[in-house]
Amino acid sequence: MASQTSAPAEPAPMPSPEAKTTEGASSYDQADMETKHAGSPCPPKQKSWLARHFSLLLRRDRQAQKAGQLFSGLLALNVVFLGGAFICSMIFNKVSVTLGDVWILLAALKVLSLLWLLYYTVGTTRKPHAVLYRDPHAGPIWVRGSLVLFGSCTVCLNIFRMGYDVSHIHCKSEVELIFPAIEIVFMIIQTWVLWRHCKDCVQVQTNFTRCGLMLTLATNLLMWVLAVTNDSMHREIEAELDALMEKFSGNGTNTCMCLNTTVCEVFRKGYLMLYPFSTEYCLICCAVLFVMWKNVSRSLAAHTGAHPNRSPFRLHGTIFGPLLGLLALVAGVCVFVLFQIEASGPDIARQYFTLYYAFYVAVLPTMSLACLAGTAIHGLEERELDTLKNPTRSLDVVLLMGAALGQMGIAYFSIVAIVATQPHELLNQLILAYSLLLILQHITQNLFIIEGLHRRPLWEPAVSGVMEKQDVELPRRGSLRELGQDLRRASRAYIHSFSHLNWKRRMLKEISLFLILCNITLWMMPAFGIHPEFENGLEKDFYGYRTWFTIVNFGLPLGVFYRMHSVGGLVEVYLGA
């Protein structure tokens, strides 16, 4: 060893003239290449045959996907236009096109959609490599729960309808019993399929699957349109019959009387009470089917294929938000019960309208201030924006903005009617304030929810940071003690940053819980009760009976859907805070 150390160092080999020439040439070539690169653009590097062939296949696959989406979208558009033409013809020309004709068309569409749903479950999903990925963001539990709840209510609605038709079987056609039976079977199977497969990203039979999804979506959309228009016609006919009965009381006989008055009253009240849920069920099915259509042939990364880690739903010490929300809920239930009791009589006293609108005027500005405070806290946070492509979140935003147009449209029509007639009366001033505050509350709440949905959850960066640190440092450090010390240091740093953001998290959770309870209250009142927008008579006298009925019956279901969808979005904001 000593001899090896004391030995003289070997002299470095001298480069040969050829090597010098080669080295000089290479340096000259390199300088020349740099000059060419700086002066003029280099010619593109030629790709290999495999890379060119692979990119060509990818391009053809994208073109095939776009063609399939275009064709299925056109199919749905034509079906909706055909059904819309039938429904409009039924409204404006009741002699040539009757309600029975529309039912026949919808029954044919339901049977076709039913056959596709069964084939999708039995055939498509059981093929090899059919469902390689499942979208973790699609079909959250509140959407599937609402699907089952509203689907069950709609099935009960059709049972009440069949019972009512059976009690009048002596003056009604027996064929009319077939349509509710088909709808019951269709809704049961559709709810079951959507519950099981709403997260699927199908990779086989993509074009056929897209067409089936669009056909089912168009069928649900036409069911919603018919439910809204048929409800308005039913209310109009009922109001006209009541007026005729008051005018000609005791004169004439009704040939279609129920044989058992008590049973018919149960069927009629059950049908009227459950009717709003059918419109909500159709809207939710359309949203779920659209997400499934967007997920056809979609490929997800390995880490997004599984269910992401989610923060559990805990109160985290929130006090004021739940208390204020429960206070609004109790007050809303009291106002709702008083108004419903008064509405069961022949006329509603003016003071109950004042109480109803005064409750809204008190709650809506509080919700708007809470939304503005939450949006400001989002701006103060250090969380990054989540810019990844997410079809479910994009659909949530579109549905949130679109559903808000329902009640906002009614509010704008009310503002015009009040300002143009008698804006100085107390009730009219309350309705005017209610309409303005409703528009403001929708805008601020949409801003708060959309801002929260596009923020990364607070727990996500810490978990991923610790995992990346483990992956990087594990091969480098051999001591488990040093690794434990690093993990403890990372935990202390996370706890320190958590304590600094704690007040923001708590404020966001307080605001989210308060808004959740308020939206539940504002969802319950129009969904289960009488609509003051029609009963107060102001807008009805200004726009006319048929026009205002159409506006209300198209706007209110969207408003109910907006409140329910807002609750789901606020739950996501609460969990991500």
Swiss-Prot record:
Family per similarity comment: Belongs to the otopetrin family.
Lineage: Eukaryota, Metazoa, Chordata, Craniata, Vertebrata
UniProt KW keywords: Cell membrane, Hydrogen ion transport, Ion channel, Ion transport, Membrane, Transmembrane, Transmembrane helix, Transport
Entry annotated with the keyword Cell membrane: yes
Tissues where the protein occurs: Expressed in epidermis, small intestine, stomach and retina.
Transmembrane parts of this sequence: 70-90, 101-124, 141-162, 175-198, 207-229, 277-293, 320-339, 354-376, 395-416, 428-450, 511-528, 548-570
Topology class, membrane: Multi-pass membrane protein
Keyword S-adenosyl-L-methionine: no
Catalytic activity: H(+)(in) = H(+)(out)
Protein name in the entry: Proton channel OTOP3
Effect of H234A: Reduced efficacy of Zn(2+) to potentiate proton channel activity
GO molecular function: identical protein binding; proton channel activity
Coiled coil feature spans: none
Notes on how activity is controlled: Activated by extracellular acidification. Activated by Zn(2+) under non-acidic conditions.
Superkingdom to which the source organism belongs: Eukaryota
Region (Disordered): 1-46
